[in-house]
Amino acid sequence: MTVKMISCGLVASIISFSAAGDNVSFPARDMPAHDVVVCGGGPAGCAAAIAARRSGLDVLLIEAQSRLGGTATSGGVSHWLGGRNDEGEWVVGGVFRELSLRAEKECAAILPKLPAGKTYQPYAWLPWFIHGVVLDSDRIALTLDAVMEEAGVEVLLETRAVGVEKSGDIITHVITHSKDGFRRMPAKVVIDATGDADIALFADCPVLFGRDDDHLTTPASLTFHLSHVDGNALWDEIERSREPKFRPLIEELKKKGEWPFPYDIFISVKGLTDDEVMINTMRLTEIDGTSAESRTKGYMRGRREAYQLLDILRKYFPGFANSQMKSIAPMLGVRETRRIDGEFKLTVEDLRRGTEFPDTIGYSMYGWDLPDPKKPSVQPMVDETGGGFVNKAKKHLVTPIPYRVMVPRRCRNLLCPGRAISVERDVLGPLRVMAPCMAMGEACGIAARQIADGAANCDVDVSALLVELRRRGCIVDKAALPLVRPRVDPKASGEVHAHVRVHMD
């Protein structure tokens, strides 16, 4: 919501929130000004903060959880996806590559390789799937703490953005709330890395929610980790059966009435130790990730299902007979909520055509993974009846990310990296995961230099931005050559839809 500042003293202000026609006033502490305030300390926000600070800007990063890293740490999804191709080559460089290599050196991550003579490897759930970076969620949080301190980024944890103040189409302050009350954070540039377009919503930028017809979103998950798993027994069975999701076994259990869930897949990823496995099987339907009531239902249902799953795994699945619950994620894994409705929108048709964009700031190598809101085991853009993005080699396709997808309307100094970008909904599949979110965040952090110097977000000199991204090793040009191109309609023109002003030489 947009907040009205009523009065201002030397150290405190009175702010007024409008709700249901009533005004409610609260004292708010005035904070020192920053060039950039980044809202959200997940992958996009962390990369944005680092990049902006390295661009010489004074940066404040606020995060609602107790640690940085977002879904990778608090969400328990110990897997940075989408940043390497199926041969293990880098598709996303810059901060993502730097953090991955540093985490590997600090024993906080593993960069998987396909074992000789094998079709599957234990760090994934698809054949030849090695492009993820497997993490220790606790240690990677420690790595992120250190990186922020080294870069000189100011961090506030357990702090949530709850509103903004605007002057015309400029955000002047971000209003936050934490244990010590409300604060007014002055900023020249605001980066909305909340994943939910919270700041865009507060700033009255147009946003969309879920599917166009019913506004339902793809299912959420509550990830959990098991210990004391016989990994060899599990991976040997997957290699033998070629069924990493155990669909035939699940069908048998359904017939017996011993699989009580609406999803019929099993997803496991080996952890950093031989006996640890991340379980990302749950598909919690009808969860609104922007509603406290709905999220509460998701947590309660998720914790219940975690222990139901554990009992079934111990009884029927190879390798799990002696497994123990190690942890259940303290944060719900939400895949989709709001998206900004920008002047430019990346569409499925753009990608079918193989459209080349003059403002591509990075790529994703992840698949078209966006489960149906009502049929949680169905992937509309992957199944045969879907969007035609399946190829015979079953290799992943490169998806380009134009700068313009991060530019909202009605606000000149706001950028929105991450899953809340301006795209046709189905395009979220390859772009919502963590490595491409880091690519987007890094581009926003670098673009913030121009915006802090007076440029509007839609008037950023993209030529200069791309030069700097390449200088920092963020854009991996080799990634622009996908292993398999999408099917191209020969009647399509492949033109670039330049709805937002982009400066190009």
Task: Please report, for each region that a protein language model flagged, where it lies by residue.
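Hydrophobic helical h-region of N-terminal Sec-dependent signal peptides
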Residues: 10-12
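Flavin (FAD/FMN)-binding glycine-rich loop and adjacent Rossmann-like elements that form
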Residues: 27-30, 73, 114, 118, ...
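Beta1/beta-strand and adjacent pyrophosphate-binding region of the FAD-binding site
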Residues: 30-42
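N-terminal Rossmann-fold NAD(P) dinucleotide-binding loop
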Residues: 45
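Conserved N-terminal/central alpha/beta ligand/cofactor-binding core
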Residues: 51, 57-58, 64-163, 167, ...
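Bacterial N-terminal signal peptides that target proteins for export
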Residues: 1-7
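Conserved hydrophobic helix-helix packing surfaces used for dimerization/oligomerization
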Residues: 36-38, 59, 414
